[in-house]
Protein backbone atom coordinates (compact mmCIF):
# COMPACT_ATOMS: atom_id res chain seq x y z
CA UNK A 1 0.00 0.00 0.00
CA UNK A 2 1.19 3.49 -0.82
CA UNK A 3 -0.14 6.72 0.64
CA UNK A 4 0.74 9.93 -1.18
CA UNK A 5 0.49 12.72 1.37
CA UNK A 6 -0.63 16.11 0.10
CA UNK A 7 2.50 17.76 1.52
CA UNK A 8 4.73 15.28 -0.35
CA UNK A 9 2.88 15.23 -3.67
CA UNK A 10 4.70 16.85 -6.61
CA UNK A 11 3.24 20.07 -7.94
CA UNK A 12 3.29 21.47 -11.45
CA UNK A 13 1.71 24.39 -13.24
CA UNK A 14 1.70 27.90 -14.60
CA UNK A 15 -0.70 30.48 -16.03
CA UNK A 16 -3.35 29.84 -13.39
CA UNK A 17 -3.37 26.05 -13.74
CA UNK A 18 -1.90 23.97 -10.92
CA UNK A 19 -1.61 20.19 -10.92
CA UNK A 20 -0.81 17.94 -7.97
CA UNK A 21 0.45 14.46 -8.88
CA UNK A 22 -1.29 11.69 -6.94
CA UNK A 23 -1.16 8.05 -8.08
CA UNK A 24 1.18 7.11 -10.93
CA UNK A 25 3.78 4.48 -11.83
CA UNK A 26 6.55 6.56 -10.20
CA UNK A 27 4.46 6.80 -7.03
CA UNK A 28 3.54 3.14 -6.57
CA UNK A 29 0.57 2.63 -8.92
CA UNK A 30 1.39 0.52 -11.97
CA UNK A 31 -1.82 0.84 -13.98
CA UNK A 32 -3.54 4.14 -13.08
CA UNK A 33 -2.47 7.77 -12.99
CA UNK A 34 -4.48 10.27 -10.95
CA UNK A 35 -3.94 13.96 -10.23
CA UNK A 36 -5.74 16.99 -8.85
CA UNK A 37 -6.08 20.05 -11.08
CA UNK A 38 -7.08 23.57 -10.09
CA UNK A 39 -7.92 26.19 -12.71
CA UNK A 40 -8.02 29.71 -11.35
CA UNK A 41 -10.64 32.09 -12.81
CA UNK A 42 -9.73 32.83 -16.43
CA UNK A 43 -7.30 29.90 -16.72
CA UNK A 44 -7.55 27.27 -19.46
CA UNK A 45 -5.82 24.17 -20.74
CA UNK A 46 -4.52 24.11 -24.30
CA UNK A 47 -6.58 22.13 -26.78
CA UNK A 48 -5.22 18.60 -26.75
CA UNK A 49 -6.02 14.94 -27.29
CA UNK A 50 -5.11 11.86 -25.28
CA UNK A 51 -4.06 8.33 -26.17
CA UNK A 52 -6.32 6.80 -23.50
CA UNK A 53 -9.60 7.61 -21.76
CA UNK A 54 -9.46 10.38 -19.16
CA UNK A 55 -12.04 11.07 -16.45
CA UNK A 56 -12.45 14.38 -14.60
CA UNK A 57 -14.46 14.35 -11.36
CA UNK A 58 -15.35 17.96 -10.55
CA UNK A 59 -14.96 18.77 -6.85
CA UNK A 60 -15.73 22.51 -6.73
CA UNK A 61 -16.39 25.44 -9.00
CA UNK A 62 -17.50 25.32 -12.62
CA UNK A 63 -15.70 24.84 -15.90
CA UNK A 64 -16.49 25.21 -19.57
CA UNK A 65 -15.45 22.27 -21.76
CA UNK A 66 -15.02 22.33 -25.53
CA UNK A 67 -15.08 18.74 -26.80
CA UNK A 68 -15.08 18.02 -30.53
CA UNK A 69 -16.19 21.60 -31.10
CA UNK A 70 -19.22 21.31 -28.80
CA UNK A 71 -19.59 23.34 -25.58
CA UNK A 72 -20.44 21.75 -22.23
CA UNK A 73 -20.55 23.05 -18.66
CA UNK A 74 -19.13 21.05 -15.76
CA UNK A 75 -19.95 21.64 -12.09
CA UNK A 76 -19.15 20.12 -8.71
CA UNK A 77 -20.17 16.46 -8.61
CA UNK A 78 -20.13 16.03 -12.41
CA UNK A 79 -17.85 13.57 -14.18
CA UNK A 80 -16.45 14.28 -17.64
CA UNK A 81 -15.16 11.27 -19.59
CA UNK A 82 -13.03 12.02 -22.65
CA UNK A 83 -12.39 9.22 -25.14
CA UNK A 84 -8.98 8.84 -26.80
CA UNK A 85 -8.11 11.09 -29.74
CA UNK A 86 -10.98 13.53 -29.15
CA UNK A 87 -9.76 17.16 -29.11
CA UNK A 88 -10.81 19.08 -26.02
CA UNK A 89 -9.93 21.96 -23.75
CA UNK A 90 -11.25 23.06 -20.40
CA UNK A 91 -11.39 26.59 -19.01
CA UNK A 92 -12.68 28.40 -15.96
CA UNK A 93 -14.96 31.29 -16.87
CA UNK A 94 -16.27 31.56 -13.30
CA UNK A 95 -15.29 33.77 -10.37
CA UNK A 96 -14.08 30.88 -8.16
CA UNK A 97 -11.36 28.25 -8.70
CA UNK A 98 -12.39 25.03 -10.44
CA UNK A 99 -10.97 21.84 -8.92
CA UNK A 100 -11.16 18.26 -10.18
CA UNK A 101 -9.49 14.90 -9.72
CA UNK A 102 -8.47 13.34 -13.02
CA UNK A 103 -7.56 9.75 -13.90
CA UNK A 104 -6.28 7.89 -16.93
CA UNK A 105 -4.42 4.69 -17.67
CA UNK A 106 -0.76 4.72 -16.69
CA UNK A 107 1.33 5.52 -19.74
CA UNK A 108 -1.46 7.53 -21.35
CA UNK A 109 -0.07 10.39 -23.40
CA UNK A 110 -1.22 13.90 -24.22
CA UNK A 111 -0.84 15.39 -27.68
CA UNK A 112 -0.75 19.19 -28.02
CA UNK A 113 -0.53 20.87 -31.44
CA UNK A 114 3.07 21.51 -32.38
CA UNK A 115 4.41 18.97 -29.87
CA UNK A 116 4.84 15.23 -30.00
CA UNK A 117 2.96 12.85 -27.72
CA UNK A 118 4.20 12.92 -24.12
CA UNK A 119 3.32 11.50 -20.72
CA UNK A 120 2.45 14.50 -18.52
CA UNK A 121 4.92 14.71 -15.61
CA UNK A 122 2.13 14.47 -13.02
CA UNK A 123 1.04 11.15 -14.58
CA UNK A 124 4.51 9.60 -14.96
Language-model segments: residues:
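Conserved short histidine dyad/triad with adjacent acidic residue
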Residues: 35-50
Amino acid sequence: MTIIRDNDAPRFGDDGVSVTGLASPSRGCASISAWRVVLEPGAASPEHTLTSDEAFVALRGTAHVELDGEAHDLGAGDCLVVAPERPFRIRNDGAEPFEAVCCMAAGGQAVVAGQGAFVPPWAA
